[in-house]
Each structure stands twice: as C-alpha cells, then as structure tokens.
C-alpha cells in the first residue's frame, strides 16, 4: 500500500506537467477568483452562465496577456506542429517496423530484444495520437475532440517520455551485463526482462492515472478556444507541486540517467581492458556509437524538459508567475524526438535487427532469407571441403 501511495503521489506530479502558450486577453477584475494553469495563469469568470441559441454555456476562464500571447503565437501554432509532423512522419513507420521485426522476425527473445520491443511499443502508442495534437496546435490551440481523447493524448504523451527513460536504462544496464557476464543463462535473463518490463508498465500506468481522472479541457471565452492540458484551475493544485515535480525529475530522470552513464563508462573500461582483436575493436566502436546516441537523446530530449519543469514550478511556487514556460514548451516538444532516435539505438545494439531491417526494406520474406542463409552455409561448407580435399591431395603427391 505504501508503494501504491507513492506511485499516486508521483502521478500527481505528472498531471501538472505540460501546457501551451500564445495570444492576448482582457485584464482580470480584482473580484474574480484566482485560478492557475499547469503552466499558464488564468482566472475563473464568475458572471452568470452565457447562453447561446438558448443553450447554457459553462463559464470559462480568462487569462493574462502573457498566457494569451503564448496560446495564439507562432511558437504553439507553427513551430510545435511542424516538429510534431516530422516526428510523426519518421516515428510511425520506423517504430512500427521495429516492433514488427521484434515480434515476428526475431526468433530468439533475448533481454535486449524484450526491452527494445517495449521501447518501440511505447513510442508507437505515443506517436499514433500525434495527428490530434498537430490539429490542435494548427487550429490555434483549440481542442474539438472531447475530454476523453484529450486525456488519452496527454497520458500517452507523458507516459512515453518516462517509459523511454526507464527502458533505455534497462537496455544500457543489460548491455553492460552481457559484456561482463556473457555466459549467463539466456532463458533466466529473458524472464527477468519480462518481469522488469511489466513492472515499468505498471509504474507508468499508476503515475499517469491522475491525467485520466482530472479535467483537461478548459474553455477560454476571450479567445473562443478550448485548451487541452494548458490551463488548470488553481484549486486543483493541492499541496506543493514543486516538490512533486522535483521528486519525479530525480527519481525517474536523474537516477536512471546516472545509472545509464555509469553502465556505459564501465562498458568502455571493460572493452578497453580486453584483448583488442579485430572483432573486439568493432564491438568497441559500435558501443561508442551507441553511447553517443543515447547521451544525445538524454541531452536533447530528456534533460531540458525535466530541468525546465522543475524551474517552471519553482517560479510558480515562489513568484506566482513563470516566464520560462515558452522554453519549457520547446523542450517538451524536443523530448518527442526520442521516438525518431530510438530506432537508431536498435540498429547499433542488435545485429539481428540490422539484418532484419535490411531484409524488410528489400522486401525479402522470411522464407527467402532462410533460403539465402542455407545457400550461403552450403557454399561455405563446399569451399571448406574443397580446401581440405586439395590439401589432402598435395599430401599424397608429396609421398
């Protein structure tokens, strides 16, 4: 029960993590109730409900000029959708193909394959909802798809980021363990990988539960738009959210990042201390490329968003206003690039993935690949037999 409570606590963190920006609106009257957005500050309008065509319309929120400028500016209506379009166009087919390879083309389910399959699944579950997010930003941050789809979009959006961090950490530790202990029992390792993967999915589900429970869409009459996860009433901000987000940044980002970096440093030391034949040198170079790719993902995708998240809520806590939210939006947008980088990680980690990806791009069926492998093996055996026969003949003639 204690662990469940902690998971719910972390969930409360995630739920206040995103938001948008850009447009203008009216100044707030002093008699109105304060309401604070997850990132933008607004106020609940208390006048009687407006009616349109005889149908009551629920009171909306008014926001300050800074928040309005973000919600209507080019940052959220041009830059963000362009990046999301790029991520969708690259991430959907690449992760779809990766998941297909891991599930249907890879026979041996090693721990690395299990972690990479889960990572590809997390990316795919996030990317498939991007058309809704792209449409939302292109239409001036106006959400027209209902409350339920907004909750699903936000839940999968944040769940993907933390899933990627945790599965990338597992993959890094597993790669180091393979180098240090190459003779370990593969079936036992695979069972452990399955258990760890299930635990990660359960943790992410618990963490994102509040995103599905709380109201995510807010109507802003001054702009005539309905925002999705961009404005939230102040009364829902229960407790010190800065501490929650700080805990999430330390527990789900900083600690896994340090663990990943440590695993790669030890991996390089181990490879350097081993005998450097041609095969070991290729393995070391591939490991270095993998390290560079993963570190680039952390520094570009995860570090800025988690750092600015903490700074943003610290400013809201201490100054009741945050002017770094536009930067946080950019960082959060860049965090989605991990869905494009992950397939390159699979390429560097797994030779089987490289072979299967090449065969898939060349439209070779499994049967065709098997025939080619049998033919190649037969040719190698024939050459070895011919070499043995010629050496035997030369021995006989010498006598």
Curated annotation (Swiss-Prot):
Location of the protein in the cell: Cell membrane
GO function terms (MF aspect): G protein-coupled receptor activity; G-protein alpha-subunit binding; G-protein beta-subunit binding; heterotrimeric G-protein binding; protease binding; proteinase-activated receptor activity; thrombin-activated receptor activity
Protein name: Proteinase-activated receptor 2
Top-rank taxon, per record: Eukaryota
One Pfam assignment: 7tm_1
Residues carrying sugar: 33, 224
Membrane topology value: Multi-pass membrane protein
Subunit structure: Interacts with TLR4, COPS5 and TMED2. Interacts with GNAQ, GNA11, GNA12, GNA13 and GNA14.
Family under the similarity heading: Belongs to the G-protein coupled receptor 1 family.
GO biological process, one term: negative regulation of JNK cascade
Highest classification ranks of the organism: Eukaryota, Metazoa, Chordata, Craniata, Vertebrata
Chain segments annotated as transmembrane: 74-103, 111-139, 152-179, 186-213, 238-271, 280-319, 326-349
């Amino acid at each position: 029960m204690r662990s469940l409570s902690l998971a719910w606590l972390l969930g409360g963190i995630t739920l206040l993590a995103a938001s948008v920006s850009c447009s203008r609106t009216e100044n707030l009257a002093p008699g109105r109730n304060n309401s604070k957005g997850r990132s933008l500050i607004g106020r609940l309008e208390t006048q009687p409900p407006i009616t349109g065509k005889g149908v009551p319309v629920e009171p909306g929120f008014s926001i300050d000029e800074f928040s309005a400028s973000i919600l209507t500016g080019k940052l959220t209506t041009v830059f963000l959708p362009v990046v999301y379009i790029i991520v969708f166009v690259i991430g959907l087919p690449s992760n779809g193909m990766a998941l297909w390879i891991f599930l249907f083309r890879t026979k041996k389910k090693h721990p690395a394959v299990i972690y990479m399959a889960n990572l590809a699944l997390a990316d795919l579950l996030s990317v498939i909802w991007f058309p809704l997010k792209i449409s939302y930003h292109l239409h001036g941050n106006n959400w027209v798809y209902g409350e339920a789809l907004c909750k699903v979009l936000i839940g999968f959006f944040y769940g993907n980021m933390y899933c990627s961090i945790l599965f990338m950490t597992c993959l890094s530790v597993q790669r180091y363990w393979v180098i240090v202990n190459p003779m370990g029992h593969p079936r036992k390792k695979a069972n452990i990988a399955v258990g760890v993967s299930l635990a990660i999915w359960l943790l992410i589900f618990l963490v994102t539960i509040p995103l599905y429970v709380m109201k995510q869409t807010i109507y802003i009459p001054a702009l005539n738009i309905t925002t999705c996860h961009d404005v939230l009433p102040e009364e829902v901000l229960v407790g010190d959210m800065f501490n929650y987000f700080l805990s999430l940044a330390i527990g789900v980002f900083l600690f896994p990042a340090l663990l990943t970096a440590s695993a790669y440093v030890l991996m390089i030391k181990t490879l350097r201390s081993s005998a450097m034949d041609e095969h070991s040198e290729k393995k070391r170079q591939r490991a270095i490329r993998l390290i560079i790719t993963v570190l680039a993902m952390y520094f570009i995708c995860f570090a800025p968003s988690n750092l600015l998240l903490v700074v943003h809520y610290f400013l809201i806590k201490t100054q009741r206003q945050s002017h770094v939210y536009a930067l946080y939006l950019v960082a959060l947008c860049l965090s989605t690039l991990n869905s494009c980088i992950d397939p390159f990680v699979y390429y560097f980690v797994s030779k089987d993935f490289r072979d299967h990806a090449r065969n898939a791009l060349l439209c070779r069926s499994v049967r065709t690949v098997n025939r080619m492998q049998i033919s190649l093996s037969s040719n190698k055996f024939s050459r070895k037999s011919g070499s043995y026969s010629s050496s035997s003949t030369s021995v006989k003639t010498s006598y």
